[in-house]
């Protein structure tokens, strides 16, 4: 809802300021194609979420994969038969166009993962407020400012290959640097500020590379398409951004929780609900007698009600000194598991960017420009 006022102002401004343009010869919109595309993407998201949340429902996973595959194949076949397809797949035969789309998907995929991973990690482990963790994650966008502004100027001097593939490679390096910043005390309890220098440096470096890529990906997509496909190319560009963000939240978000479930080692006597998510573990810690440390105390007011007293087992239900000690052990176990899953997700982002850099470097010739 925070975006509603901004959208309302933009809509009013467009209504009164933007000139109206109509194309009497516009291609007809094909509703069945849109439905098939929506069904294929929705099934893909459902399959990803099902596969990354143990215990895996094999029946639901198989149904989602089969539905997505059938809908995707039906969409492709329909586009090949239509005189005015919703998506002309021949556009992807142009290397610059394909590289631009891949670059756009890679950037938005990684950006979504960074925003989610950093904000979640520094809220649940380091005790940051949502505003503080959001501002920390936004350092990535600060890094994109110089390269995204200057990318268009550099394009005619160094070409698409260095900007798209090179930008993705620099972004991967930044992700690796950022993944090393886990602020922990020697005692094992998380610190609020240690290691932030590495994180900020890594996010700035990643932003610098991703900004260079995204600044020219649009140029590569639109200018590589024939004039009569310019509108379709613009639509593909927008879908690439949205598809990357969609995959990021569905895959990396689910993986963040799924890996936590795999990595967490619960102390004896702790309710199994603590293995579902770190918020559930913190809820149990708080319910055992308020054992949350000072830097996490404010989270106790906002935790979801995932457990109640009858759900506690062993000494955690006693509310005594032993309960508080076991709660402290659960806290460290949960935070350690979440940090491990966070690190894996950050490294996976670096791997995705490295793969994107290699593929786009193969697609594009040295000093190639969009044409």
Model-predicted segments: where are they?
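Helix-loop-helix hairpins in multi-pass membrane proteins, especially solute transporters
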Residues: 1-33, 59-62
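Hydrophobic transmembrane architecture of multi-pass small-molecule transporters
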Residues: 185-194, 243-359
């Amino acid at each position: 809802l925070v975006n509603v006022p901004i959208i309302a102002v933009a809509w009013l401004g467009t209504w009164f300021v933007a000139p109206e343009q109509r194309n009497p010869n516009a291609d007809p919109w094909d509703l069945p194609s849109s439905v098939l595309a929506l069904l294929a993407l929705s099934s893909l998201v459902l399959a990803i979420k099902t596969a990354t949340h143990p215990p895996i429902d094999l029946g639901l996973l198989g149904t989602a994969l089969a539905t997505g595959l059938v809908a995707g194949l039906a969409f492709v076949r329909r586009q090949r038969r239509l005189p005015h397809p919703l998506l002309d797949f021949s556009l992807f035969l142009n290397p610059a166009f394909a590289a631009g789309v891949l670059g756009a998907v890679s950037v938005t995929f990684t950006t979504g993962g960074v925003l989610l991973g950093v904000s979640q990690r520094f809220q649940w482990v380091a005790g940051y407020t949502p505003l503080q963790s959001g501002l920390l994650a936004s350092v990535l966008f600060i890094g994109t400012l110089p390269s995204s502004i200057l990318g268009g100027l550099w394009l005619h001097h160094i070409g698409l290959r260095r900007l798209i593939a090179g930008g993705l490679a620099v972004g991967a390096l930044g992700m690796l640097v950022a993944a090393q910043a886990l602020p922990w005390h020697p005692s094992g309890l998380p610190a609020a500020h240690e290691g932030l220098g590495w994180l900020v440096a890594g996010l700035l470096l990643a932003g610098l590379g991703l900004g260079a890529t995204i600044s020219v990906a649009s140029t590569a997509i639109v200018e590589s398409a024939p004039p009569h496909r310019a509108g379709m190319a613009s639509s593909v560009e927008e879908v690439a951004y949205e598809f990357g963000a969609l995959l990021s939240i569905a895959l990396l978000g689910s993986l963040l929780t799924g890996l936590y479930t795999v990595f967490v080692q619960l102390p004896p006597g702790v309710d199994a609900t603590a293995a579902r998510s770190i918020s559930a573990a913190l809820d149990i810690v708080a319910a055992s007698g308020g054992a949350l440390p000072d830097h996490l105390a404010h989270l106790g007011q906002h935790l979801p009600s995932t457990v109640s007293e009858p759900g506690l087992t062993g000494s955690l239900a006693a509310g005594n000194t032993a309960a508080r000690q076991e709660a402290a052990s659960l806290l460290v176990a949960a935070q350690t598991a979440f940090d491990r899953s966070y690190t894996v997700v950050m490294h996976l982002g670096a791997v995705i960017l490295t793969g994107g850099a290699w593929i786009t470097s193969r697609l594009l010739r040295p000093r190639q420009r969009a044409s």
